[in-house]
From Swiss-Prot:
This is Double-stranded RNA-specific editase B2. SUPFAM superfamilies: dsRNA-binding domain-like (SSF54768). GO terms for biological process: adenosine to inosine editing; mRNA processing; RNA processing. SMART domains: ADEAMc, DSRM. Residues 20-34 have a biased composition (Basic residues). It comes from Rattus norvegicus (Rat). Residues 23-35 are annotated as: R-domain (ssRNA-binding). It comes from the Eukaryota. One of its GO terms (molecular function) is double-stranded RNA adenosine deaminase activity. It is found in: Nucleus. InterPro entries: A_deamin, ADAR3_DSRM_1, dsRBD_dom. The active site is at E441. Residues 1-36, 50-105 are annotated as: Disordered.
Length: 746
């Protein structure tokens, strides 16, 4: 009985032990489930993967065997850790016990490691574009739409943004891409190194040490750029100042983005003996400037597509606190122009290609010529709404810029024009209501007459300050003259039609007789334009006057070429016969040609052909304007010329459009530049302003009489025509006299 009871107690004790063990197992399983559920809810963006499906590039090997999370844990601690055997199979001999496992089994009955991988979220993996990066560095920037060019099916947008005082313009097929391009150009202007490797390489550190960024260390001097040592190497740069390292480190610890100017060059002056023209040779201006001011950065301000496959770049560089710009068909050419402008302005250095010699003493400084060209083209772009207007089409663009001396800071565009046509003979007017010649250079000169009349009319104003604003001052002997240092510069986008354009693409030798060019027979000859067409032909026959009835019956209306007319302005002046009653002759200081030019030949046809003119009266001279091309020559524009001419005068809001075939405005009215309008303005001035002509008497009744009243002007004009004939260059062809036989009207 006792044995039975003992065995019963023994069996009861065993069953109670098994029950306790099972309770403990259930308790451990429930705790393990709770841990897994807590982890799954906390790590929602994570997912579980088996070893066969993991991506080693994207996963983070984590272990959930321990509840502790330690900072700066070694990577080796995060490897696979199997559960202890006692935890999953106590004794290992109870196969009858079925348990649910929270994890999959594998690898011989061991639990697989729990692998957690961050989901590839778009916001976390997509790199920041230029717009976002620029906004983070410079918040609050304003992007503005500059222009929209191109056809409707393939538009080209231009968007600009101003950063650090510089305007960056980007172009693209959409506004978004143009905006992105502008942001990229702005970032390149002040972000020197896009990644750390380039920064260390540039600063002299080929490798960067491995750094634990999870440690508690605040600064990592070994991973930053090398600090500039206090200079004991000041032999090369005697004006150097050491960098304030304490200031840099303290600013870094405060976490500020720092702009600190390193005075590496001081007030160093160039070694002129080392940079003499003979030593410079054919060196690039960018290289020369870099020797004087090392470490300069060139910034691309704009990149515009003027035409298909034709781009224009504007580069800028800041030297000694001054900004210099250059433009060109490539960034390399634009950088060269900016560097040349800086060399000339700061160091008075001209490279051999820019140094005027004895044979080139009549050349205009290249940087000044480029500035005038840019002023004219930018003004035309502004008036045509970024070249989007239908009237932006042109084959030739001309403009006159007024300066005080050669200071481009005070330069002002006063007139603009475009056009390449002349009127048809059937539209000729005997009342002075049409503009006969609508070529850009000629229209620019007529617009300049409009400007001169406006300046003279200021002397009729009742306000005392108005005469002071005029470019004219009164002369004691009578009449008016230009104020001191007022200069006018003519810009033409292509060589003027006539002899200047005929020979411009070719090199002209010093000995003209040795030239083998096919047109040497007519070189320097007077030429006339083709009616309602383009191009010129040499003057034919000795007849100098056209007849009114012959033109009406079908004879071609002959107009002298632009080259010959500009040559006459260098003797007679720009003001014409009527204004000679009031002012002294006004001459051009320079002529700038955008393309198809040869400076030597241009000087010969503009000035040298009139060397035999003889002695001229007082206030008249044989003017020799300074000549220059531009660095950024305009590309050839194939296609037909537009049948209109546009003109603008300072003070006017919009362009005036003239039909080049009829010589009148597109609406049918007379242009502000026609003879009839000018004669009325002249009549209002006559008798109220002091004149240069003694005993001028009453106002003439006819336009032709007013022109003949300028006796000195007419005599110089005849003297010029005889000089052309004497040189064997042909006879100047005049319009029918009936054109000027109309009454003056007030």
């Amino acid at each position: 009985m006792a044995s039975v009871l003992g065995s019963g107690r023994g069996s009861g004790g065993l069953s109670s032990q098994l029950k306790c063990k099972s309770k403990r197992r259930r308790r451990r399983r429930s705790k393990r489930k709770d841990k897994v559920s807590i982890l799954s809810t906390f790590l929602a963006p994570f997912k579980y993967l088996s070893p066969g499906t993991t991506n080693t590039e994207d996963e983070d090997n984590l272990s959930t065997s321990s509840a502790e999370v330690k900072e700066n844990r070694n990577v080796s601690n995060l490897g696979t850790r199997p559960l202890p055997p006692g935890d999953w199979a106590r004794g290992g001999s109870t196969p009858s016990v079925k348990r649910k496992r929270p994890l999959e089994e594998g690898n011989g009955g061991h639990f697989c490691k729990l692998q957690l991988i961050w989901k590839k979220l778009s916001w976390s993996m997509t790199p920041k574009n230029a717009l976002v990066q620029l906004h983070e560095l410079k918040p609050g920037l304003q992007y503005r739409m500059v222009s929209q060019t191109g056809p409707v099916h393939a538009p080209v947008f231009a968007v600009a943004v101003e950063v650090n005082g510089l305007t960056f313009e980007g172009t693209g097929p959409t506004k978004k891409k143009a905006k992105m391009r502008a942001a990229e150009m702005a970032l390149k202007s002040f972000v020197q190194f896009p990644n750390a490797f380039q920064a260390h390489l540039a600063m002299g550190s080929s490798t960067s040490p491995c750094t634990d960024f999870t440690s508690d260390q605040a600064d990592f001097p070994d991973t930053l750029f090398k600090e500039f040592e206090p200079s004991s190497r000041n032999e090369d740069f005697p004006g150097c100042c050491p960098v304030d390292t304490e200031f840099l480190s303290s600013a870094y610890r405060r976490g500020r983005l720092l702009y600190h100017t390193l005075d590496l060059m001081g007030q160093a002056l160039p070694d002129r003996s080392r940079l003499a023209p003979g030593a410079l040779g054919e060196r690039n201006p960018v290289v020369v400037l870099n020797e004087l001011r090392s470490g300069l950065r060139y910034v691309c301000l704009s990149e515009t597509a003027e035409k298909p496959r034709v781009k224009s770049f504007v580069m800028a560089v800041c030297v000694d606190g001054r900004t210099f710009e250059g433009s060109g068909r490539s960034k390399k050419l634009a950088k060269g122009q900016a560097a040349q402008a800086a060399l000339q302005a700061l160091f008075d250095i001209r490279l051999p290609g820019h140094i005027p010699s004895r044979s080139k003493s009549n050349l205009l400084p290249q940087d000044f010529a480029d500035s005038v060209s840019q002023l004219v083209t930018q003004k035309f772009r502004e008036l045509t709404v970024g070249l989007t207007s239908v009237y932006a089409r042109h084959k030739t663009l001309a403009g006159i810029v007024m300066t005080k001396g050669l200071d481009t800071k005070q330069a002002q565009v006063i007139v603009l024009s475009s056009g390449t046509k002349c009127i048809s003979g059937e539209h000729i007017s005997d009342q002075g209501l049409v503009v006969n010649d609508c070529h850009a250079e000629i229209v620019a000169r007529r617009a300049f007459l409009h400007f001169l009349y406006t300046q003279l009319e200021l002397h009729l104003s009742k306000h005392q300050e108005d005469p002071e604003r005029s470019i004219f001052i009164r002369v004691k002997e009578g009449g008016y003259r230009l104020r001191e240092n007022i200069l006018f510069h003519l810009y033409v986008s292509t060589s003027p039609c006539g002899d200047a354009r005929l020979n411009s693409p070719y090199e002209i030798t010093i000995d003209l007789n040795s030239s083998k060019h096919i047109v040497r027979k007519f070189r320097g000859h007077l030429r006339t334009k083709i009616e309602s067409g383009e191009g010129t032909v040499p003057v034919r026959g000795p007849s100098a006057v056209q007849t009114w009835d012959g033109i009406l019956l079908g004879e071609q209306l002959v107009t002298m070429s632009c080259t010959d007319k500009i040559a006459s302005w260098n003797v007679l002046g720009l003001q014409g016969a009527l204004l000679c009653h009031f002012i002294e002759p006004v001459y051009l200081h320079s002529i700038i040609v955008g393309s198809l030019h040869h400076t030597g030949h241009l000087a010969r046809v503009m000035s040298h052909r009139m060397e035999g003119i003889g002695q001229l009266p007082a206030s008249y001279r044989q003017n020799r304007p300074l000549l220059s091309g531009v660095s950024n020559a305009e590309a050839r524009q194939p296609g037909k010329s537009p049948h209109f001419s546009a003109n603008w005068v300072v003070g006017s809001a919009d362009l005036e459009i003239i039909n080049a075939t009829t010589g009148k405005r597109s609406c049918g009215g007379s242009s502000r530049l026609c003879k009839h309008v000018f004669s009325a303005r002249w009549a209002r001035l006559h008798g109220r302003l002091s004149t240069r002509i003694p005993g001028h008497g009453d106002t003439p009744s006819m336009y032709c009489e007013a022109k003949r009243g300028a006796h000195t002007y007419q005599s110089v004009k005849q003297q010029l025509f005889k000089a052309f004939q004497k040189a064997g260059l042909g006879t100047w062809v005049r319009k029918p006299p009936e054109q000027d036989q109309f009454l003056l009207s007030l």
